[in-house]
Amino acid sequence: MSPATVTIDTTPDFSNGGAPHSTLLLAPPAMAAQQDAMAAALTDAAPLGSRPELYMLDRLAAGLTNLAPAAYDLVLVLASGADPLLSRRDVFAKIADAMKPGAKLRSRDGSPLDAAIAKEAILAGLVESAEGAYEKPAEEVAAVPLKFLKKKNKGEGGGPVQSPAAATQPTAPAPAAAAKSLPNGVVMVDLNDDFDVSDDEMIDEDELMTEEDLMRPIQQPPECAPKPGKKRRACKDCTCGLAERLEAQDKARRDKADKQLQEKAATPFKLASEDLNELDFTVQGKTGSCGSCALGDAFRCADCPYIGLPAFKPGEEVTILNNVAQL
């Protein structure tokens, strides 16, 4: 006689009835050489029903590692202080997308996160909780009903109410498109309708001030008044007309100076004999007006005719041969 078939149930007798708790560990590049520290972090983050995963921040920033969207319930940062990779906005956006709604981000040791990291967490849409962690809020989609105004001037039969004067006049046939009833929620808009905005309400800005207003003297503010002993200047955002007035005065002063220079340029300038003898050092006892022409270029005036010549003694004859001074 063959034995009866025996069925063995391999399913666990006790089950928590929920998905395993996923934990994401983010380690800086400097922690790659510390194998013991990473093993301890994985051990601490692996309680009953937890599934920890360790990723390096440099590989995540370089795009060599991709995180699954909405896959982690807890994100632990193993960096103790400020980390430049974790402060990058593109890296933090990937971390925020990988968090489930209601997931939390905090440091492993429970210390507050760096200010730069906390700023990026808030910009990524996370909300700071009372424990110092940053939680991803759950998003809800809600429908907003739109309310439309009821049509006015309706009779009991649903037709428009006509005035007695309009009832005696023959009504024009309505267009075929307007005769059709519109479904609920559909509103017909006339593009030629100006929505009861009359042209009389438009104000011409040129008519705001009359000729009498323009002829009134400008009231100068006290802060624009010239201070004693100082030159009068206009403000950067001058509105009292002082800037235009000073600019006109400067233009008139420049035009006058240019005119005087043109008049002097048209008249040739001639030196008298006594002016030439004053600078002629071949004459014994004659010196220049400054008395420093013979000392060299360092002591000569800007318009001295001896610029470029070496120093010489007063009374010594100076000749130029082949562009070379001969003393």
From Swiss-Prot:
Chain sites annotated for binding [4Fe-4S] cluster: 290, 293, 301, 304
InterPro entries: Anamorsin, CIAPIN1, Dre2_N
Feature: compositional bias, Polar residues: 1-14
GO biological process terms on file: iron-sulfur cluster assembly
Residue ranges annotated as motif Cx2C motif 1: 290-293
Stretches the record annotates as N-terminal SAM-like domain: 17-144
Chain sites annotated for binding [2Fe-2S] cluster: 224, 235, 238, 240
Any one GO MF annotation of this record: metal ion binding
Region (Fe-S binding site B) residue spans: 290-304
GO cellular component: mitochondrial intermembrane space
Keyword Ribosomal protein: no
Cofactor(s) annotated in UniProt: [2Fe-2S] cluster; [4Fe-4S] cluster
Compartment list: Cytoplasm; Mitochondrion intermembrane space
Region of interest called Disordered, as start-end residue ranges on this chain: 1-20, 153-179
Start and end residues of each stretch annotated as Linker: 145-214
Keywords of the record: 2Fe-2S, 4Fe-4S, Cytoplasm, Iron, Iron-sulfur, Metal-binding, Mitochondrion
Domain of life: Eukaryota
Region ranges (Fe-S binding site A): 224-240
Subunit structure as annotated in this protein's UniProt entry: Monomer. Interacts with TAH18. Interacts with MIA40.
Family affiliation: Belongs to the anamorsin family.
Function as written in the Swiss-Prot or TrEMBL entry: Component of the cytosolic iron-sulfur (Fe-S) protein assembly (CIA) machinery required for the maturation of extramitochondrial Fe-S proteins. Part of an electron transfer chain functioning in an early step of cytosolic Fe-S biogenesis, facilitating the de novo assembly of a [4Fe-4S] cluster on the scaffold complex CFD1-NBP35. Electrons are transferred to DRE2 from NADPH via the FAD- and FMN-containing protein TAH18.
Domain notes: The C-terminal domain binds 2 Fe-S clusters but is otherwise mostly in an intrinsically disordered conformation. The N-terminal domain has structural similarity with S-adenosyl-L-methionine-dependent methyltransferases, but does not bind S-adenosyl-L-methionine. It is required for correct assembly of the 2 Fe-S clusters.
PANTHER family in UniProt: ANAMORSIN (PTHR13273:SF14)
Protein name, per record: Fe-S cluster assembly protein DRE2
